[in-house]
Structures are given as structure tokens and as C-alpha cells.
Amino acid sequence: MIYQGKSLSAQLLEDGIVEFKFDAQGSVNKFDQATFEEYIAVVAAINNCSEAKGVIVTSGKSTFIVGADITEFLVSFSQPEDALASWAKKASDVFDSFEDIQLPTIAAINGIALGGGCEMTLACDYRVAATTASIGLPEVKLGLMPGFGGTVRLPRLIGFDNAATWMSTGKAFKPAAALAQGAIDAVVEPENLQAAAISMLKLAIDGKLDWRAKRQPKLEALKLSPTELIMSSTTCKGMIAAKAGKHYPAPMVMINTLIASANLDRTGAMAAENTGFAKLAKTDAATAQIGLFMADQVIKGKAKKASKLATKAVNKAAVLGAGIMGGGIAYQSAYKGTPIIMKDINDQALDLGLTTATGILTKQVERGRMNAKKMAGVLNNITPSLSYDSVKDVDIVVEAVVENPKVKGMVLAEVEGVIGEDAILTSNTSTISIDLLAQSVKRPQNFCGMHFFNPVNKMPLVEVIRGKDTSDETVAAVVAYAAKMGKSPIVVNDCPGFYVNRVLFPYFAGFSQLVLEGADFTAIDKVMEKQFGWPMGPAYLLDVVGVDTADHCTGVMSSGFPTRMKKIDNDPVSTLYANERLGQKNGKGFYDHIKDKRGRPMKVPAPVAYELLGQHCADKKDFSSEEIIARMMIPMVNEVVRCLEEGVVDTAAEADMGLIYGVGFPPFRGGAIRYLETLGLDNFIAMADKYTDLGEIYHVTDGLREMAKSGKSYFTTDVKLA
């Protein structure tokens, strides 16, 4: 052993081969400050070992290296930009020092090699991957770019265009694809990885492979003519501008860095990377996207903990109500491996549910993501039934019948009489109080809400709603089942609208007030989509949700919060609903939903909608983009703050992820609380105070004012003030 640290070691094997092993004390290998310090020591030990003839880099984990420890490096990100660039240089210098070892080097990639893990392999002369490995540079998903030499080495290995694609998409590549592009040199079965890597390394040691020639291009400028560089850069920039847009700066900064460093040697190119990395790390988008990554880890961590605490395992499920929603729930459960009974009262409904599941699966097969055998296996996990007897042995029931408290209560009471006493009963409801529904069951401790979002197979969020009598064991089991289904569960306490709908409808109220004052709904949509970043503006979103559904939810929210969310007179949503303009579901809402010449769906502003709304709205008035954004977002942010203060949702991280996963809040803004803190609490309060005459939804809470006064952050403070 020539070096032994807590995470890294270097051992001299036979024939002068040094095994440089990453084997951290935790579950995965990642780059943190302690690992960097050991990395420097390993390089020194190898350089001082006179018997060393070559180096193989290995992992003692099932993964290779998952990347950098972003939680630790966030402290460095708080530095000024020039200091951050210096920090990035120190980190990338460590990789350079390894690459400069005057011995052949090879990486034996046994599993995931992402971010810094991928960059570790790029610093080697050769790369051999197991068939189970994956490799990529996903930093763009955090609003960042590679910072350990990825922008320098990858384009010199696989070419400008391929490297631009790798980095701007953040995609992880399977070994075969990486091999075809030249990112790795061989692919072998996992059991042969070590032997294959050592065999290739010996060829390099013996001079049968020219490792110096293999390394040299990574130290020089790219082999591109001026014309080739112009063509490649123009194409890449055009594609990125179209896909990423103005709100996500990382892809364009990466491409500009590649362009700037194309004619530079490693030293110059590294300096360009250090500068670009520091620039991106200081952007609001990076702060937001890193925050989302960490929030997602919070949710996953809670789900993992729930899985360990759950005393009731869910091995068989049932869904009551086989409509589109029931079919989607059945598909998701079956697809992720939990057999499910799909029960309804008539064959037509069962056919609809099966058609929904089959349609989702067929698309998977058509896109090459699933074969026919897998599709058949998933369908075999779904058992349609007209009888309650079929569900008597299930571990969990998801009731998904019509959104009517009387109907739901009746169905819940019926099925509770059939299932086992320790079976869990849940209701997929978007608005009906769980405590109200619990009055229909005899074992309320085994009952909670399980709010899926449509379409179930695409929307990640599930709200697990705790009633006043719901047991911790029930919550843990349902969270574990949702996670098993591949969903991101967030536990919320029962209240009107739960969490997502409760904070969404004040946003819709802001929209309705603007329209009544003369704003054009298409202008509002344009501002909220193009400038704020929502995937759909409020009018379009209402059409997609369903104008009838939105009108119903507005009534629920009005009953629950009669002062703050009282029904708006001549609400545009109610006006359209009264005239049977239900949105996308019947082809007419704020927009007319038609098909273009190629048969693709499209929307056009509906003249009839303008006519109907004009009967109650003020004359047309133009509002500035700033005012539209303020009047739309203040009510939502205020309601999220109230939910945190009341303990409806536990943490700011979960509050933000609920909006990202549930309604498509722009990820580059990081969620409502991240948006609030990016604006600055004092600035938000000053903005909201301008609109207090518009109603209580624009009034900030005393708790928010106290947070601003004390300079606290919602991400580091217990905010349950109510």
C-alpha cells in the first residue's frame, strides 16, 4: 500500500500496476474537500513510487463516482465570482496533476460515472466500462457547467458537436453509445472489467498502445479549422437557444466556453472553464436549480425513511373507479411492480381504464422504451373486476370515483367492510376534506388522502393528506407505496385544497381580477409563459385543468376561506362554465382547441370567449409585464407562506417541490419560496403592499414581515408560527 486514506487508497499490484481506488465511507463515492486533499496525496504517492509503471482507477462501490458533493461546495459558491474562479482552478489543477503523471492510466468504470466522476475518467488515458455503467456530465441540470476539466477534455476526445450535446443536455450515456462516440475505449461484462482494464494497461506499459499519443490531444487546441468551428458553433447555439431559451443560461455559457477555448491549449482552456463555471455558479438560475436538487433529496430521504418505518408492506393494491384517472393509477402501480385490482361497477368503465393503461404502454413500445413482453407483464398485473370480493385481500385501496363527497363516502364505507382490518384506505381527491370523508369509515386511523395529478404517468407529485385521526403508520405506508410507484410524495395536513390547489387558486383569482379590469387573457398568458417561465399561462392552464373543475374548486376554496378567497362577482371562469365552455375537454374555453392541417392539436383565442367576458369586464386595458407578474404571483406566494406557517406542509423545500412537480412552476425560479427569497423579502413586501386594496390575497402575513425584519431564511428556519 503506497497510500491509505479514508476515501482513497493506492496499492501496488503485480507488474508495477498501481490501483488507485475510490472507496468512501458512505454509500457512494463523491468529490468533497477531504477527497480532494487525499487525491493530491495519492498523486504525490504515485509520482514518488519508483516501481510504478501504470495506474488503474477503480471503485469499491457498486457505482464509480457520482459527482461532486454539491452540499459542501455551496459554501464556496457564496464567494465573489473571482474568488470562486480561483477555487475552481484549484480543483481542476488536481485533475491536471493526475493527467500529467508520466505513466499510462486507465479507468475501470463499473457503474455510474457522472459529473466529477466522468471528469475523473476523462483525465485518464484510457477508459473501459462495464455494460452496467453509465457516463455523463449532468451539471447543466443544476444550472452549472463542468468544473473539473470536462469542457476541455471531452471535446478533444469526441469532437465539438458531440461534446456540446453531452453537456447541454446533461444526458447520461450507456456504454455502447459512449463507445461509438469515442468517450470510452472498450465495453466488457462486469465480471471481466478489472481483468480487461489491466490487460489494456499492460499493453500501454509494454508500448503496444501509445498512451502518450492518446493523451496529447487533450493537452492541445481542438483540431478544427475556422470554418468548421463557425459551422459547429452556429448550429449548436441555434439549437440551444431554441431549447433552453433565455431563462436557462448554463447551456449557452457552456457553448461559448467551448468556442472560446477551441484554439487554446489545456492551460488556456481550463482558465476559460474556471471563468465560465464561476459565472454560472453566481446566477439565480443555478441557485434555484441546486435548491431543487437538494429539495428533491429531502423528499427522497423522507420517502426512504418512511419505507423503513412502515409496518405495513404494500404487495397488492386496488383502485376503485376505472376511468382515465383510475386507469392511470392502475398502470403506474402495475408498471412499478405492484399488482393491482381495478374495480368498477360497469364494463364500459373497466374498458376505459384498460384502454388508458394500454395506450400508455403502447406509446412506450412504439418509442422503443419497452418491449412487447414487458408490456404484457404490466397488463397482467392489472386485474379488472366488477366485484368487491376481488379486493378483500389487498393491502391498500385507492378510491378514485367521481369528485362527490356523498358518492366517495358511500364507496369508502362499502369497501371498508370488505377489506382486512389492517388494510389501508385512501381517497384520490383534489378538494374534498379528508376529515369529512373519514366520517364515513370506522377505522379513520387507517385512512388518508392520496392525491394524484393528471396525467398520472407523467406527473411526479402525489400529495399524501393526513387527517386528524390518520396514524403515523398509515402515512408511512402510503408514502412508501407512492415512492414504490415512482412518485415524489409530499405529506400535507388536511385543509381546503390541501397544498397545491390551495396555493394555485389565489393565483387564478389574481388572473380573474386582471381580466375583469380589462386585461386580455392572451396577453396575461404571454407574459406568464415567455417572461415568468410557466409552461402554460393561467387561461391555457384553466382550459387544460377544465373550466368546470376550476369552478368547482373555486367554490370549495371559497367555502373554506370565505373572507380571503370569497367568490369573485362575474368571475370569468364561472362565466365560461355557465356557457358550457369547459376548456380542452369539449374543445372550447378561453381558447378554441382545434387541429391544424397536419392533425396536431392547437389553440386559438376564442371570439366567443371574448364576447362572453366582455359583458362583465371593463374596457380593454394594457398592463405592464411587471404588474401582470406581480398581481399573478403575490397571491400564490402569500398562500404558500401561510401554508408553511400553519404547518400544512413541513418545509420550504417540500413547498417548492410541490409546485414544481404538481403544476409546473418554472424550475429556473426554484419554486415560490425560492422566488420570494431571490426577490428579497423586503422587496416582495413592498411590492405586495402596493396592491393591498385588491383584497386579502395580496396581504402579507405578520410572520413574513417578522422574517424580513430578522433577516431569516425559510430554508433554514422553523416557520410554523401559527
From Swiss-Prot:
InterPro entries xrefs: 3-OHacyl-CoA_DH_CS (IPR006180), 3-OHacyl-CoA_DH_NAD-bd (IPR006176), 3HC_DH_C (IPR006108), 6-PGluconate_DH-like_C_sf (IPR008927), ClpP/crotonase-like_dom_sf (IPR029045), Enoyl-CoA_hyd/isom_CS (IPR018376), Enoyl-CoA_hydra/iso (IPR001753), FA_oxidation_alpha_subunit (IPR050136)
Pathways involved: Lipid metabolism; fatty acid beta-oxidation
GO biological process terms, semicolon-separated: fatty acid beta-oxidation
CC annotations in GO: fatty acid beta-oxidation multienzyme complex
Ranges in a coiled coil: none
Alphabetized UniProt keyword annotations: Fatty acid metabolism, Isomerase, Lipid degradation, Lipid metabolism, Lyase, Multifunctional enzyme, NAD, Oxidoreductase
SUPFAM superfamilies, sorted: 6-phosphogluconate dehydrogenase C-terminal domain-like, ClpP/crotonase, NAD(P)-binding Rossmann-fold domains
Domain of life: Bacteria
UniProt-annotated catalytic positions: 451
Catalytic activity: a (3S)-3-hydroxyacyl-CoA + NAD(+) = a 3-oxoacyl-CoA + NADH + H(+); a (3S)-3-hydroxyacyl-CoA = a (2E)-enoyl-CoA + H2O; a 4-saturated-(3S)-3-hydroxyacyl-CoA = a (3E)-enoyl-CoA + H2O; (3S)-3-hydroxybutanoyl-CoA = (3R)-3-hydroxybutanoyl-CoA
Entry binding sites for substrate: 296, 501, 661
Molecular functions per Gene Ontology: 3-hydroxybutyryl-CoA epimerase activity; delta(3)-delta(2)-enoyl-CoA isomerase activity; enoyl-CoA hydratase activity; long-chain-3-hydroxyacyl-CoA dehydrogenase activity; NAD+ binding
Residues the record marks as site: Important for catalytic activity: 119, 139
EC annotation from Swiss-Prot or TrEMBL: 4.2.1.17, 5.1.2.3, 5.3.3.8, 1.1.1.35
Location of region: Enoyl-CoA hydratase/isomerase: 1-189
Region of interest (3-hydroxyacyl-CoA dehydrogenase), residue spans: 311-722
Keyword Hydrolase: no
Binding site for NAD(+): 325, 344, 401-403, 408, 430, 454
PROSITE patterns: 3HCDH (PS00067), ENOYL_COA_HYDRATASE (PS00166)
Quaternary structure and partners: Heterotetramer of two alpha chains (FadB) and two beta chains (FadA).
Protein family membership: In the N-terminal section; belongs to the enoyl-CoA hydratase/isomerase family. In the C-terminal section; belongs to the 3-hydroxyacyl-CoA dehydrogenase family.
Record-given protein name: Fatty acid oxidation complex subunit alpha
Species in which this protein is naturally found: Colwellia psychrerythraea (strain 34H / ATCC BAA-681) (Vibrio psychroerythus)
Native organism taxonomy: Bacteria, Pseudomonadati, Pseudomonadota, Gammaproteobacteria, Alteromonadales
